[in-house]
Amino acid sequence: MYTQISSFKINKVIFKTEKFNKNDELKIVQITDFHDNKRINKAKMMKEIKELNPDIIVLTGDIIDFKTEDFTNTISLMKGLLKINSHVYFVEGNHELRHKKGQEFLSYIKKIGINIIDNDCKKVIINGKHINICGVEFLLEKTDFEKAVSNIENDKYTILLSHSPNRPLIYVDSRVDLILSGHTHGGQVRLPVVGAIVAPGQGLFPKYDKGVYPLGNTTLYIDSGLGCSVQPIRFLNKVQFSYIIVKGER
């Protein structure tokens, strides 16, 4: 079980969109639920991410744990990511929200160049492609979602970052092309055929635990994360980050 929480894998996922021309693609690295994991070889992970050469890097919350006393390990991760690409976007998770020094942590990462986009949206141009990168806070309400997407250009590809996969679903509509989230840890402990036994916010045998979920014109993707909470245990569920490629087919 120790290797399940210390030796990471890269989960590659491909999505397609008619909002990009054929032969165009957007490369994304998603990191979620790191929980200040000191067991991971960060130098190796940075090397792997650099070789992937992502266009943007997204952090979908719980990068620290609510028990984290020293932010040094996580700040080192953040600085390493910024050296690879300055396009790093972040939304808070419940552990940042719960931490007694959570606001201090958020203020610092913003100061060093991390783009915090809780209830906000950034319009960016990546290699000629116009993209909306939006985010919502963990305890979102409809007004928060509307604030995040109110000024998007509907003909541009829109990514929504949300720590929780299930909380925004009652609000999300076709304005959003791709939702990237975490929070579930894939259940941490999984069983063959059954999948996740339990996930926060969903209880036993969750509907949304990890992977890809088509939702009409929107797609939800849940990364199972790089860390653990409560107990340092994973089973049939190795820690990971995701390499996401959005390919054009217009």
Task: Identify the residue ranges that each predicted region occupies.
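Solvent-exposed loop/turn segments at secondary-structure junctions
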Residues: 63-66, 94-98, 122-124, 138-141, ...
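Beta-strand-turn-beta hairpins that frame and shape the catalytic cleft
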Residues: 16-29, 114, 122-134, 154-156, ...
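Short, flexible loop segments at the rims of nucleotide/cofactor-binding pockets, characterized by
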Residues: 33-38, 65-69, 136-140, 157-158, ...
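N-terminal membrane-anchoring alpha-helices
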Residues: 1-23
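Conserved beta-sheet core of the metallophosphoesterase superfamily
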Residues: 165-243
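Binuclear metal-dependent hydrolase catalytic cores centered on His/Asp/Glu-rich metal-binding motifs
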Residues: 100, 106-107, 111-114, 121, ...
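Membrane-embedded segments
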Residues: 21-115
